[in-house]
Amino acid sequence: MTLHVNLKVMICDHDFYGLHAINSYLAWDRRTRVVALTQTVGGIFEWLERRAEAEWPDTMILDTEDIETPDELKSVITRIRAKIADVKVVVLEHIPRAEFALAAMDGGAVGYLVRNDVGLQIASTIAWLQNVPFAISSGVEKVIKPQINKRLATAVVLPKQRPYPELTDRIRQAIQLCVVEGMSADLAADEMGVSPHTIRSYIKEGYRIMEASDRNEYPAEMSAQERAFMRFTALDDSDTHQFLPPDEPDSSQPQD
């Protein structure tokens, strides 16, 4: 896990619920600090004009819903990068498109990712992308592999969520409600149809399992809930691999 601290993030997402869900998950993780929200590309530049450069983001999350063509995506990314020096642009897609992946790479983005692949791991993903030239997610890899050329051969595939196989479904649900969503034990107990004591037992066991699988060090002032959130939403570093496009036919071999 990369423990960057205080990465400033701006989120551009046309969907109100998506915008605020991403904001919420990033707020839980002290590695990231959301500095601005907007639902339009134009809103990005309007906000930048009103703020001092010291307030500008280190990372820009960009939704493509209102971007109609690959050329437009490339142009938007290029414009953002021309305005903000060294910014990391992360493109989030609903459905992966090969031509948009190439446009993101050509524009200088550091990631072209399917939202459902990223999931709860959005803060861990942003931290991980700080040291990656260009990444795609597993959903993008599956869709584009049969049709793309070798221009994406340098892309790295985003790791999936750290698995924690010992976590049962009920423990996962309790952690999701109490750690990720911030519910009290009483409210989570009502949601799951068990006693608050049982919820606390689930959480305690979940903490133990995740801590046993984690070799990272955390700041002393970080609460147990914060550490649990970071562990639950961590990436599986052992799953990192490079995108491998399909092999081209070997011209030295006789063809039928």
Indicate residue ranges for each PLM-predicted region.
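N-terminal regulatory/sensing modules of transcriptional regulators
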Residues: M1-N149, D250-D256
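Basic, Lys/Arg-enriched C-terminal extension of HTH/homeodomain DNA-binding domains
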Residues: K204-D256
